[in-house]
């Protein structure tokens, strides 16, 4: 496995650039990484990294001061004004890399009905649609039956309204129709109570703090949920009809509020 550490910067830092940049040492052809880069995300944050560090543990999602320094120093060669003070969060992911540095997209030779999509690194971002088509063919072959395309399938779903992006007139109409859209819960990202409830009522339920964050970005701003998390916990608990100490950050066992007896110590 190969771990990569990345950083997300405050939206204010996006004023430094509006494109994708990367520095690659062409003299090091044996390198297993381009060294990451700088890019503006769809939500207008700057994303730095990743680096590439071999790890024996496939679930090693730890970040290190050394890794963060490595990424920052490398990207400062492209943009000297980058500062650690702009970092709002950092994280790591692990890639199933191969020593051949090649994609492995094929039906398993040992496990029935198992399709492998491994060894996929940075190029996988652009290759994903083609990879999905190949895997679809492998799955159909594995089933061994003739499958017809559902012509009635509609891949377009109605999105959750983004209050912060609406013109004033449309926002006023939406709030008059449902006042919850006028209650701003996440100040950093301007996410309303109505948007959070929409996410909780979606076909694929996400009654966790991280689930709401990924659906509507509540908690993804500068304070990283420091202000809005308690309100989000309350909204989830009320909507789901559960106690606040049953609301999890990500999954069962990651509840964020303890309602047990006090031991008398702080």
Model regions: which residues?
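Iron-sulfur (Fe-S) cluster-binding segments and ferredoxin-like electron-carrier domains
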Residues: 59, 192-203, 226-244
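Short cysteine clusters
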Residues: 186-188, 223, 228
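Central beta-strand plus flanking loop segment that forms part of the substrate or channel wall
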Residues: 1-22, 73-76, 80
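Low-complexity, small/polar and acidic-rich linker and loop segments
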Residues: 241-266
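C-terminal catalytic lobe of FAD-dependent flavoproteins
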Residues: 25-27, 32-35, 42-43, 54-184, ...
């Amino acid at each position: 496995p190969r771990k990569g550490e990345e950083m997300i910067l405050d939206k204010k830092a996006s004023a430094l650039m509006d494109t994708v940049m990367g520095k690659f040492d062409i003299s090091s052809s044996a390198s297993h990484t381009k060294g990451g880069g700088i890019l503006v995300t769809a939500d207008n944050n700057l994303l730095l990294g990743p680096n590439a560090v071999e790890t024996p543990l496939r679930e090693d999602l730890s970040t290190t001061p050394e890794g963060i320094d490595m990424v920052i120093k490398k990207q400062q060669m492209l943009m000297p004004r980058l500062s650690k003070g702009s970092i709002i969060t950092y994280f790591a992911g692990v890639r199933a890399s191969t020593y051949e540095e090649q994609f492995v997209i094929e039906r398993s030779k040992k496990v029935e009905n198992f399709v492998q999509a491994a060894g996929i690194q940075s190029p996988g971002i652009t290759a994903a649609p083609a990879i999905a088509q190949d895997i679809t063919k492998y799955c159909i072959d594995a089933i061994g039956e003739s499958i017809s395309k559902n012509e009635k399938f509609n891949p377009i779903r109605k999105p959750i309204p983004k209050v912060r992006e609406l013109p004033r007139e449309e926002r006023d109409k939406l709030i008059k129709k449902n006042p919850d859209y006028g209650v701003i819960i996440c100040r950093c990202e301007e996410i309303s109570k109505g948007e959070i409830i929409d996410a909780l009522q979606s076909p694929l339920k996400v009654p966790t703090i991280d689930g709401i964050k990924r659906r509507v970005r509540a908690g993804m701003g500068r304070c990283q949920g420091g202000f809005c998390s308690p309100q989000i916990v309350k909204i989830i608990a009320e909507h789901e009809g559960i106690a606040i100490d049953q609301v999890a950050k990500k999954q069962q066992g990651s509840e964020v509020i303890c309602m047990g007896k006090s031991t008398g110590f702080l």
